[in-house]
């Protein structure tokens, strides 16, 4: 049972459940948006033997982990379950859950599941090789991460699952279903299936029919911040929440993260610096890229969409560099009681802008239709240890992440006509003051860094609060609750240096991709079906 105490009144807190790629969290906020308690548990996705690229989502075990986090968060907050006014859930996007006619979840895959490479290729050939273009025009998605090839894979290889399927939702919706017994999806997350119409914010059943798939398995669509149901007695017994507590429709992690950052108005722009880096720009109305380079997702704000570009493995590349080459710096940082990245940034701050011409080759700009990258490498190294050392390479990596972001933002501006005048930098990368300044210098934009740098759970809590009338609207509340840590103005001289570096990098990267095309090097990552 939930632990009782006397220092709180009923309904003065909100709970957000955040199902990420690598972990699940239960986070409790007060009504001023302050985080009160959090509990987190890592989870592992299941590779199926003899199914290359498979990454199944363990429904039974992961629900147990979610319940564990809920119980522990309540205990850490020292509040009774009756103090929770509402609960909402968010998750990684693209991952799907399938239910049978009895409402039982019977199969799920994580966002990174890539088993359907053959099906992607097969689908691209439909309708005189125009099917993917039709999917993109309607939904803003290509087939690489879509639910359509995964459903086709099930029809081909797991007909026992496919023919029992009654409903499909996203992982955030599954968590809400496990709490309430009610099934629905929201546009921001369901939009990443490639089956949702950007204009109507509802399903486009004809896309499934065009692919020869069933169109009778789509859940009702409800907007973020609306009432889904209430905590069931069964869920209350499993996770110690109070039966009858409202469960509010949540959404996709990036869109709710933008809500938590106050990125809720047209033309507002954010760079989210995590394992992947996302460059997100709000558009006032749906529009897609004629070149299909970037994805378009429904925002949690009704009527608004977000263009989203992705830089691959940016945060992971920095971690690889730290762990592979900077053992000494890690030891020194530990002795000094500081983060190793802070020490590396201090070293890199003494390297001039442009990093002596060193060009990292890791993530390409986003090319959603034909998405692959060159082989990881550093180009234009020097054997002068004063100019080419760990500090130089670290700075070069930070500069390169900013250059890729700037290129992606330029692609968005080219087709949308929306030009950012500043940007919000959040996520783990924004903790670096040097990195934040480099991003300002490369883009030529003022960079705003929030106090709360991981804002997805806060955005989810805002949805919960709006759903029970604690706050009036999503957009107004997102703007009200965001607090700013610092601001970085671009340096015009550095901007000029980086413009030249950017042009050189783009030319060199094109040649490096050609080496992959020729089979001489191995791509950092390729989308399924390439």
Swiss-Prot record:
State where the protein is found. Cytoplasm
Give the EC number(s) under which this enzyme is classified.
2.7.1.189
Q: Which Gene3D superfamilies match?
A: 3.30.420.40
Which Gene Ontology CC terms are recorded? Answer: cytoplasm
One GO BP on record is: carbohydrate metabolic process
Reaction catalysis annotation? (S)-4,5-dihydroxypentane-2,3-dione + ATP = (2S)-2-hydroxy-3,4-dioxopentyl phosphate + ADP + H(+)
Task: Show the InterPro entries listed in the entry.
Answer: AI-2_kinase (IPR033676), ATPase_NBD (IPR043129), Carb_kinase_FGGY (IPR000577), FGGY_C (IPR018485), FGGY_Carb_Kinase (IPR050406), FGGY_N (IPR018484)
Per the record, the domain of life is Bacteria
Q: Which UniProt keywords apply?
A: Cytoplasm, Kinase, Transferase
Q: One short Pfam family name for this protein?
A: FGGY_C
Cysteine disulfide partners in this protein:
none
Q: Which CDD domains match?
A: ASKHA_NBD_FGGY_AI-2K
Drop me one GO molecular function for this one.
Answer: autoinducer-2 kinase activity
HAMAP family with a match to the protein in the record: LsrK
**Protein's job:** Catalyzes the phosphorylation of autoinducer-2 (AI-2) to phospho-AI-2, which subsequently inactivates the transcriptional regulator LsrR and leads to the transcription of the lsr operon. Phosphorylates the ring-open form of (S)-4,5-dihydroxypentane-2,3-dione (DPD), which is the precursor to all AI-2 signaling molecules, at the C5 position.
* Similarity section: Belongs to the FGGY kinase family.
This chain's protein is named: Autoinducer-2 kinase
Please name the gene that encodes this protein. Answer: lsrK
């Amino acid at each position: 049972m939930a632990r009782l105490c006397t220092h709180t009144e009923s309904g003065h807190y909100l709970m957000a459940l955040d199902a990420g790629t690598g972990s699940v969290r239960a986070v409790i906020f007060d009504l001023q948006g302050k985080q009160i308690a959090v509990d987190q548990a890592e989870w592992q996705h299941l590779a199926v033997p003899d199914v290359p690229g498979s990454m199944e989502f363990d429904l039974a075990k992961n629900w147990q982990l979610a319940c564990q986090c809920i119980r522990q968060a309540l205990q850490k907050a020292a509040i009774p379950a009756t103090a929770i006014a509402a609960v909402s859930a968010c998750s990684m996007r693209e991952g799907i859950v399938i239910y049978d006619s009895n409402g039982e979840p019977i199969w799920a895959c994580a966002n990174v599941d890539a088993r359907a490479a053959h099906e992607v290729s097969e689908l691209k050939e439909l309708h005189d090789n125009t099917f993917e273009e039709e999917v993109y025009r309607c939904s803003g998605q290509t087939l690489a991460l879509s639910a359509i090839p995964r459903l086709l894979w099930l029809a081909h290889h797991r007909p026992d699952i496919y023919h029992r399927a009654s409903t499909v939702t996203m992982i955030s919706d599954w968590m809400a279903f496990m709490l309430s017994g009610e099934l629905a999806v929201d546009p921001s997350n369901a939009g990443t299936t490639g089956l949702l119409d950007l204009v109507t914010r509802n399903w486009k059943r004809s896309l499934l029919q065009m692919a020869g798939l069933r169109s009778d398995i789509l859940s009702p669509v409800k907007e973020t911040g609306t009432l889904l149901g209430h905590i069931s007695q069964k869920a209350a017994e499993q996770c110690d929440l109070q039966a009858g507590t409202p469960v509010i429709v949540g959404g996709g992690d990036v869109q709710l993260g933008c809500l938590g950052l106050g990125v809720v108005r047209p033309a507002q722009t954010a760079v989210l610096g995590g394992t992947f880096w996302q460059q997100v720009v709000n558009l006032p109305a749906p529009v897609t890229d004629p070149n299909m380079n970037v994805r378009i997702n429904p925002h949690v704000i009704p009527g608004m969409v977000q263009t989203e570009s992705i830089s691959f493995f940016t945060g992971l590349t920095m971690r690889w560099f730290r762990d592979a080459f900077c053992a000494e710096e890690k030891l020194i940082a530990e002795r000094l009681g500081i983060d190793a990245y802070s020490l590396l940034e201090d070293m890199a701050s003494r390297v001039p802008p442009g990093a002596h011409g060193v060009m990292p080759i890791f993530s390409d700009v986003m090319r959603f239709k034909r998405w692959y990258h060159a082989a990881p490498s550093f180009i234009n190294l020097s054997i002068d240890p004063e100019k080419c050392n760990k500090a130089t390479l670290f700075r070069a990596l930070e500069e390169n992440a900013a250059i890729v972001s700037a290129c992606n933002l330029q692609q968005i501006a080219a087709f949308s006509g929306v030009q950012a005048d500043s940007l919000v930098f959040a996520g783990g990368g924004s903790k670096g003051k040097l990195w934040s300044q480099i991003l300002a210098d490369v883009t030529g934009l003022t960079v705003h860094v929030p106090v709360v740098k991981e804002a997805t759970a806060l955005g989810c809590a805002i949805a919960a609060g709006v759903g029970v009338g604690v706050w009036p609207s999503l957009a107004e509340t997102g703007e009200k609750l965001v607090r700013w840590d610092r601001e970085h103005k671009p340096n015009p001289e550095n901007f000029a240096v980086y413009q030249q570096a950017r042009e050189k990098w783009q030319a060199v990267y094109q040649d490096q991709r050609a080496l992959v095309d020729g089979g001489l090097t191995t791509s950092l990552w390729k989308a399924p079906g390439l």
